[in-house]
């Protein structure tokens, strides 16, 4: 199984565990100094008139096609986005269309993507439609990513910020966003049974300190397990097979002032991306 390249990975895994991120090539004018987006059926690919542009000291460039009337995006917000990522030659390397989804939720500030994403999104507002140039140093850098993203490649992100998500559960220091729930009416997780899940976990300082997808080894947990902090218990209670949820758990519901060894520092907030595989 390929390593994670994008926020799309859990969605692709849910559809087909053996299928990774694909890439699609479209033509570019060889004399152009800017990325050329061809006209297709999707709004992200249509030509648009720029109404504003900013270049930041860190190398990020943002071109606005539409300025939204919603609130400014801040650290910890979860927003629904419609997006595609291209290389300079217009090769598409990422996008929600790969999973046949109209949008994908993105949690700002917790390494769901490269550092450039987290920085750029904090310059946007709900309703913005933009193209963002993410320099390689804030993307995949010198390493690139396998045969998908070359070394030292800038990324060009075309994105519509559709809305800010409201938590499905908000309790104390825990905010849970239910991304998907199957109609399957199976056993629900509680104090007496066992839950099997795929899990990604990050803090602002430690990207994916837990990643069960990497070696395809799901986690099995019981209610009273030491790893199960209060935020996980609140969010996983009554969850069932097929549920996909995002969590942002503040220190008081996570590991508090003690942290969790070298994984979670004192008073750190934790982001989780969880796919429930089975409840037994």
Language model feature labels by segment:
Residues 4-13:
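Sec-dependent N-terminal signal peptides
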Residues 15-280:
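Cross-family detector of peptidyl-prolyl cis-trans isomerase
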């Amino acid at each position: 199984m390929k390593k994670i390249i994008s926020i799309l990975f859990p969605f692709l895994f849910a559809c087909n565990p053996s299928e990774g991120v694909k890439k699609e090539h479209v033509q570019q004018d060889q004399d152009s100094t800017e990325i050329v987006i061809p006209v297709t059926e999707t709004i992200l690919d249509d030509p648009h008139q720029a109404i504003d542009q900013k270049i930041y000291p860190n190398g990020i460039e943002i071109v606005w096609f539409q300025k939204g009337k919603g609130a400014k995006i801040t650290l910890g917000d979860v927003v629904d986005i419609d997006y595609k990522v291209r290389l300079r030659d217009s090769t598409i390397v990422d996008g929600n269309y790969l999973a046949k989804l109209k949008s994908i939720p993105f949690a700002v500030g917790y390494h769901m993507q490269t550092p450039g994403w987290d920085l750029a999104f904090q310059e946007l507002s709900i309703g913005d439609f933009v193209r963002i140039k993410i320099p390689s140093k804030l993307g995949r850098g010198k390493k690139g990513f396998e045969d998908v993203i070359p070394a030292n490649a800038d990324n060009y992100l075309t994105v519509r910020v559709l809305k800010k998500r409201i938590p499905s559960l908000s309790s104390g220091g825990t905010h849970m966003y239910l991304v998907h729930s199957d109609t399957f009416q199976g056993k629900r997780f509680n104090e007496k049974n066992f839950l099997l899940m795929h899990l990604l976990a990050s803090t602002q300082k430690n990207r994916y300190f837990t990643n069960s997808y990497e070696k395809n080894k799901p986690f099995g947990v019981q209610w009273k397990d030491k790893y199960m902090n209060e935020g996980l218990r609140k969010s996983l209670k009554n969850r069932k097979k097929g549920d996909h949820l995002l969590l942002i758990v503040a220190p008081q519901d996570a590991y508090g002032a003690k942290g969790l060894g070298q994984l979670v520092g004192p008073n750190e907030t934790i982001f989780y991306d969880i796919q429930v595989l089975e409840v037994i």
